């Protein structure tokens, strides 16, 4: 059985995925982050704008990541009916993460879905990558529905590629078709949310893109001077 090592249950950033042969495989987010730079110009423009305003863009980015990680953790604990441990986070981070949790609760009460699992960690033996699916659920007909949580201000192409890779990973390892895939965008400023259905056409394109990234990754080392 493939193994998954997690240094902290509150974060996906330190999750190590291993295939059956014991070798480590990269995560979906590592592959996308290392091989794709479609939003590089947007990021550079934002960094320049923050610097001009006297802000440290690295600190802002890291803080946003911390809040997003905490929000994911809170939602997971809520779904599993577990206590939340908040000792290592600031009051501001906790407040913003609770906004995201409140947004999730508002969405969940009318979602008409049956919860099955949270933070499902899987490793693809066929394609040699690992990933953590935020939420697995079923609709009232018993069909499988995958949901990915985002606390970012926008939904980008990278996110589509990510959920496409998760869907293929789930279908390979669980041998069950995924009926629908959604991205649930949770606000950190209020209890508002946006529910994005990802079409089959977009998922197909996302999976094709991810396959190209898988092929590109081994070439990266060969091209270094």
Which residues does each predicted region cover?
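Nucleic-acid nuclease catalytic cores
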Residues: 120-214, 219-225
């Amino acid at each position: 059985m493939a193994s998954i090592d997690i240094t902290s249950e509150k974060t996906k950033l330190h999750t190590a995925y291993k295939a059956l042969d014991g070798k480590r495989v990269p995560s979906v987010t590592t592959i996308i982050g290392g091989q794709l730079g479609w939003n590089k110009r947007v990021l550079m423009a934002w960094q320049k704008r923050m610097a001009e305003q006297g802000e440290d863009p690295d600190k802002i980015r890291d803080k946003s990541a911390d809040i997003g990680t905490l929000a994911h953790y809170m939602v997971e604990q809520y779904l599993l009916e577990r206590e939340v441990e908040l000792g290592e986070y600031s009051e501001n981070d906790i407040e913003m993460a609770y906004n995201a949790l409140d947004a999730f609760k508002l969405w969940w009460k009318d979602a008409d879905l049956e919860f099955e699992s949270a933070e499902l960690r899987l490793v693809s033996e066929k394609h040699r990558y690992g990933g953590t699916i935020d939420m697995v659920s079923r609709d009232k007909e018993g069909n499988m529905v995958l949901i990915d949580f985002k606390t970012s201000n926008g939904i980008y192409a990278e996110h589509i590629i990510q959920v496409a890779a998760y869907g293929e990973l789930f279908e390979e390892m669980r041998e069950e078709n995924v009926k629908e895939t959604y991205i649930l965008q949770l606000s950190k400023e209020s209890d508002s949310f946006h529910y994005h259905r990802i079409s089959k056409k977009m998922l197909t394109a996302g999976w094709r893109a991810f396959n190209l990234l898988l092929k590109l990754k081994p070439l990266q080392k060969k091209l270094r001077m």
